[in-house]
Structure formats: C-alpha cells, structure tokens
Amino acid sequence: MQHAPLNFVPDAAKVPPTPGQSPNARWSREAIEALFALPFNDLLFQAQQVHRAHFDANAVQLSTLLSIKTGGCPEDCSYCPQSARYDTGVEAEKLMPIDTVLEAAARAKQNGASRFCMGAAWRNPKPHQLDAVADMVRGVKAMGLETCVTLGMLKQEQAQQLKDAGLDYYNHNLDTAPEFYGEIITTRTYQDRLDTLEHVRDAGINVCCGGIVGLGESRHERAGLVAELANMEPYPDSVPINNLVKVEGTPLAGNEALDPFEFVRTIAVARITMPKAMVRLSAGREAMDDALQALCFMAGANSIFYGEKLLTTDNPEADADRKLLARLGMRVEVQDHLHQAEGAQHSHSSHCHIDITPAD
C-alpha cells in the first residue's frame, strides 16, 4: 500500500500564493471565500504551513485585558453589554485610579502575561481622560509589558499623545463586513472606524484590528470582514478574532450560535491572508472546550487573553489555561514588543520562551 509523502498537498488545498506577501496584491472576496470552502483538513494544513513560516507554532503570547472604565457607553453596538441603551446589569463606573490599574498590570506580569490591554467604554475620550490613560500607559510600559488600549474614536492629535506616552498598540475593530455593519451599529459609521485607524497608523502606533463572528452574518460577510482587514495597507499587526458572547439584555442575546468549525475556519483564513499578524483568540473562548481551542492554535492563533475578565465577560480561569497549554506542549512567548512601528512592518524582535507549569 502506497502512502502520500509528508509534504503532499491535495489539489483541493492548492490556492494561489498568498497575496499578502506582495505589497501591491489584494485579496478578492472570492479568493477568501474559496479558502473558507476548502475541506477542513486542507484549510488547517495550509494555515499551519503559513503559521510555521513566520512563527514558532508551539508558542503563544499571553495577554491580559482590563476594563479601566466600564459601562455607560452611549453607542448602540448590539452585541455590547456596556451600552447604556440596554439593560444588562452592567453599571456605569468611573475611570479606575492609576494605582489600581498598575496593580492589575503587575499581577498580570507575575502570572505570565507579556501584554497588558486597557479598555474604556467611551465613544471617544475627553482630554482629561486621555491624560489619565497616557499616564497609565507610561506606568505599564515601565514594567516591561507590551501596551494596548481601546478607547473608541480618536483624533489625530489624540493618537499622537498616546504615541508620545509610549503606546505600542491601539485596538479599534471593524467588527464585521461593511454591508452588514449597519445591522449591528448605527451610532458610528464604518468610515469613522477607518478614520481612527488611519490616525493611529499616522502616529506610528501599531494597529490592532479584528472583528466579531456569530453576529448573524453569512459566510460571504465573514469573508468580507477578512478582506477588509487583509487589504489594509499594510494589514494589522494584531488581529483579534472574537466569537459573539451572547449577553442577556442585548439585541443579539438570542442569536443562533456559530458552528464551532466555522470559527476555526475564520482563524485559519485570517492566518493565511495576514501571515505575519498576531492572530488573537479573544472573546468567546470561555465557551470553547479544550479540543476546540487546540484546533484554533492549529489554525494559526498565537495569542490568548488570560487570567482576568475580558471586559465584562468571563474568561477561562488562569490555572485552566496553564494546564491546557502544558498538555499541548505549548510555550509562553515572552516578547520585547514583537512589532515596532519604528522598524520594518511586521518584523519580529528578539523573544524567548518559558515553559508553562500548571499549578498544583
């Protein structure tokens, strides 16, 4: 009986070379839909090949996300429990004191995180609010952690203020495809989001931009989201992929759950189309069993949010995360800012690994 060689790729898995490797090439939505349509094993095989070409396939970055200002947001994002328009049980809170934030960052670092993200439920920050966040960024940076904030829309001078404070990444997601966006949000336009991303990039801050699946979108629209991200010039350094967390009181609380394999496909397609980006397994991970998370790592996810609340939704317990990664033989990547905006786009600086030992 003959066996195919280890490097055998079936015809169904063969697609054109990755356009993302050419500065002037663009991904058509049709090409992205063709990736989604591949047999599952072929898609994961291709995604894993791309992943190994650019990253250590057994390394994962641990990120911690802290909600520094929770609730009371005036926007109407239909998935979000922090909107003041919905009765979700989330109470509006004031901006956290800087000492509280820095204590949380220190705990995150002690628990193995190398990236600390701060999120505030604002449409856009006011000057005094941004001053406070800039101080937080300086304090977290001084601990040797990679910094990211998500604060809503920014003007150019606000982005520059954050850059001057030493911010590494600014997160501002597109959420979904342009044609489906109006079904989810009406208080902020797609162009508003693109404008903020332009200001962030012009300031020299690394872009963190992804989306949410399971909003009720079609596969065609999921492909549209990936196309928007992959065709940015350049594509984002950091791409969080969120699976809708259905929260009682929000308009999407009754949505039908996305097929778990479709979520894995989305991770794989993001990896193939944005080969050098950090693909972050974000909201919704708490509902995934260990096998599904392992498939996401196989598909090219190389960062997880770890150990704290993911804004206002539960994230898996830190010890469970440690045990899972240890069972998979994965290592924690300790990074000295993977992507520096001052250097070459998507270049990687030195990094080392630490083994994960689960707590007793």
Curated annotation (Swiss-Prot):
EC number of this enzyme: 2.8.1.6
Pfam families referenced in this protein's UniProt entry, alphabetically: BATS, Radical_SAM
Binding-site list for [2Fe-2S] cluster: C117, C148, C208, R280
Associated pathway: Cofactor biosynthesis; biotin biosynthesis; biotin from 7,8-diaminononanoate: step 2/2
Positions annotated to bind [4Fe-4S] cluster: C73, C77, C80
Spans annotated as Disordered: 1-25, 340-360
Swiss-Prot/TrEMBL cofactor(s): [4Fe-4S] cluster; [2Fe-2S] cluster
Keywords attached to this entry: 2Fe-2S, 4Fe-4S, Biotin biosynthesis, Iron, Iron-sulfur, Metal-binding, S-adenosyl-L-methionine, Transferase
Co-factor note (free text): Binds 1 [4Fe-4S] cluster. The cluster is coordinated with 3 cysteines and an exchangeable S-adenosyl-L-methionine. Binds 1 [2Fe-2S] cluster. The cluster is coordinated with 3 cysteines and 1 arginine.
Gene: bioB
Source lineage: Bacteria, Pseudomonadati, Pseudomonadota, Betaproteobacteria, Burkholderiales
Family recorded in the similarity comment: Belongs to the radical SAM superfamily. Biotin synthase family.
One GO process term, biological-process aspect: biotin biosynthetic process
Function in brief: Catalyzes the conversion of dethiobiotin (DTB) to biotin by the insertion of a sulfur atom into dethiobiotin via a radical-based mechanism.
Name the UniProt record assigns to this protein: Biotin synthase
Gene Ontology MF terms: 2 iron, 2 sulfur cluster binding; 4 iron, 4 sulfur cluster binding; biotin synthase activity; iron ion binding
Catalytic activity: (4R,5S)-dethiobiotin + (sulfur carrier)-SH + 2 reduced [2Fe-2S]-[ferredoxin] + 2 S-adenosyl-L-methionine = (sulfur carrier)-H + biotin + 2 5'-deoxyadenosine + 2 L-methionine + 2 oxidized [2Fe-2S]-[ferredoxin]
Superkingdom of origin organism: Bacteria
Domain Radical SAM core, residue spans: 58-285
